[in-house]
Amino acid sequence: MLASAAALSACGGTGTDAVPTPGATTASDDPRAMQTIVVWRAHVDTLALRVAQLDSAAVALRTDGDVPRVKSAFVEARRAFKLSELALEYYTPTTAKEMNGPALPEVDDEEGPEAVFPPTGFQVIEEALYGDAPVSEREAITRETGTLRPLVTRAQTMMGAQHASDAHVWDAVKLELARIATLGLPGFDSPVAGHSLAEADAALEGVVRTLAPYHAADSTWSRVDSLLADVRAMLNATTDRETFDHFAFLSQRLIPLGQAMQQVRLSMAIGVPAELRPFRMDAATVFDSAAFDAMGFAPIDARPGTPEQIALGERLFHDTQLSGDGTRACSSCHVPEK
């Protein structure tokens, strides 16, 4: 799961806040895709409103009696973010990371180890607001809510100029399902408040609204509708992530949903973007046996290995002569069968 999450971090639409170039198999400004863009813009506008309300509540935080109001505003802002998440992560991944990245300092590889940047966004607010003494963290909370507001404004500007294709809309949905499975359900972005199940449901509501322009009354869609209802019912049956049956949810609900959505996309003859990335464009789910492409991690000018190079790599993987004392190989720890 961790490996999938790491690979997914490299899979957001463009990698930077820019408009993806539609591939040869897609057409930009597809009518249904542009209807979806309108939905996404409305979601981001709602996010801006909720973040402004959160900021106002945080500024008014003075006593313990004010904490529930701030927490309520935080929950609403987070729900608005989750509704917008698939679009923000796909088209403005840099901004999305600033809004919802982990509450950990970050080192810039290009700047060197001395360039350490503090975390920002929702997760920083969450740690302060859901800690032991949120009132004493008022300055930190208001600093972050004040940071969120221009980030959302930036996202509004970028989404206002956005174009889309059917292929990119469906790709964004597929990535969101993978994000729910690998980052949402495990509690990666709700580590303290523990709201991951409710937020996963909000993210799925974003998926439902995103695909509404494509919906049709036929058997392929009825399968998707049924699975979506089952998925959301299971998420809403409990708020306790620790007792939630993650395996059953993934194997019996979310993976079949991804597969059913793939069938709907194919039935509508919607292609996939032409970009190369670790999570294969034509994979139905992140759990497919061939979901990941090693070339997605390679330099842009790299070429696939030849059979001879692959065979050499396999021999070196098991060769103990490469270790200092000649007793260990890569396969000593990394057992391919496991």
Stretches with model-predicted labels:
Residues 77, 316-337:
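The canonical Cys-X-X-Cys-His
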Residues 231, 337-338:
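Solvent-exposed helix-loop boundary motif
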Residues 11-15:
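Bacterial signal peptide processing site
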Residues 296-317:
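Short, charged low-complexity linear segments at domain edges
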Residues 1-9:
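Bacterial N-terminal signal peptides
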Residues 287, 291-302, 324-328, 338:
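Electron-transfer interface patches adjacent to heme c in soluble/periplasmic c-type cytochromes
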Residues 20-296:
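Mature extracytoplasmic or organellar-lumen-exposed domains after removal of signal/transit peptides
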